[in-house]
Structures are given as C-alpha cells and as structure tokens.
Amino acid sequence: MKILYAIQGTGNGHLSRAIEIVPYLQQRGEVDVLISGKQWELKTPFPVKYRLHGMGFIFGKKGGVDILKTYLNLNSLKLSREIRSLPIEEYDLIISDFEPVSAWACQIKNKPCIGLSNQVATLHPLAPKPTSTDTIGKLILKKYAPTTSNYGFHFKRFDKNVYTPIIRKQVREMKITNDGHITVYLPSMDDTKILKHLKNFDKYTFQIFSKHIRSSYRQGNFSVFPLSNDAFVKSMASSN
C-alpha cells in the first residue's frame, strides 16, 4: 500500500506529531512525506519527498499569525500548480495534517483524504467553544484543508474520533526532575514581548526559548535561549 502523509509546515506541532506517526505507517506500507510551508525547525528523521511552498501561515512577533506577511507570502499561481501537479492518484491512502495542497488535490480529483490534526477537532460540535465566535477563523478551519473523514486531537476526548495529544518518544522517556524554573515557548511572540508580560513575576525563574534570537542572554530572573529541540525538552522535563 502506498501512503502519502502530508504535513502543515507552520510551526513544529504538526511535524512533532508526524515524527511519531510516520514510523507506524511505514510498518503498514510505503510512505511518502510531504511538507508545505517553511516555518518549522525540527529535524525530520525520515526522507521528505515533497517540499512545497503551499499556503503556510507566517508567525508574527506580537502573538498569533502575521496576516500581512502571510498574504505577501501567498503565491496563488504556484499553489494552483502544486495542487494540480501532485500525483495523488499514485497513492492508496492520503492523510493530511491540516495540509492544503494534498487536501485540495484530493478535492479536485475526487479522492478520499483523511484529516488527522488538532484543527479538525475544534470543528467538532462537542468541542469547547470560545464565548465569542470568530467567523473568519472558523471559515478558514473549514476550507483551508478540506477532508472527507477526520480524526482529531484535543486535551479532552469528547468523541470516538477525537484522541488526546500524541507526545513524542523523546519527551516521554525524559527523566523528570524539578529545578524550580518555568519553561516558556511561544513561537508567535518575540522574547522582548514575553519579558514585558512576565516582568512582574519576579519571584519565579523562567527559561524562555525564542525562535527570534541567535544567542542566549540573561536578564534578571529570565534566561533566554535560541530555539533548540534538545535544550527545550531538557528544560521542560526539569521545570517546576
């Protein structure tokens, strides 16, 4: 069986999940991996056959997605070419982790596509909802990477097709200690913004990991480090 596993390349969450899932799929068939977007830092322990521009979101530095940069990064002609040229007819099973090229290629060519992401869980009728409705955000979740069947991930399992988050083996096998610090990682917010929000918590020690810096520094009760998978996991395992 030939399997296409398509990953959203905005941030490291989707790729982190794939690191655990792909080896299991490889036991069931021949797996090709696709990644679209460019805002991910984790190393892939498996070959990536398709590296596409896609329709990725661009993180800002003030929290959330930078709408302007995301719009400027959008290349609709290239996206259309990628969708139409992706040879999904060669695959028996297509899985999309909120990845738009594979999902829309399946839509156009009338192929089943399985959604496997935390995003599909948020659309479930039983999913916890915010007090105010974000109509545009909800529309994006529905239309960005449409799939024919869905399996979601959420902190609470409220349906048979919704599962608790997948935690990487590297994290699960870490020795847990308590060095007294609080570990912080907010990829869509730069370190200066985080420091501003946490400055009044002077009784606590923080280890902050930021993708927006190249060298570490210390400021009062804050230690700030450039993003490193191993260092972050170690910090998290030894946090308070």
Predicted segments, located by residue:
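Short, polar loop motifs at secondary-structure junctions
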Residues: 35-41, 97-101, 150-158, 208-216
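Structural motif
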Residues: 2, 92-93, 181, 240
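A donor-sugar binding/catalytic signature common to diverse glycosyltransferases
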Residues: 93-101, 105, 115-116, 231-240
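Active-site-proximal region of nucleotide-activated glycan assembly enzymes
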Residues: 112-163
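A short, glycine/small-residue-rich beta-strand->loop->alpha-helix junction that serves as a flexible
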Residues: 6-19
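Conserved nucleotide-sugar donor-binding subdomain of glycosyltransferases
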Residues: 64-93, 100-101
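Conserved nucleotide-sugar phosphate-binding/catalytic loop shared by glycosyltransferases and other
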Residues: 5-9, 31-78
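Donor-nucleotide binding loops and adjacent catalytic segments primarily
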Residues: 167-171, 175-238
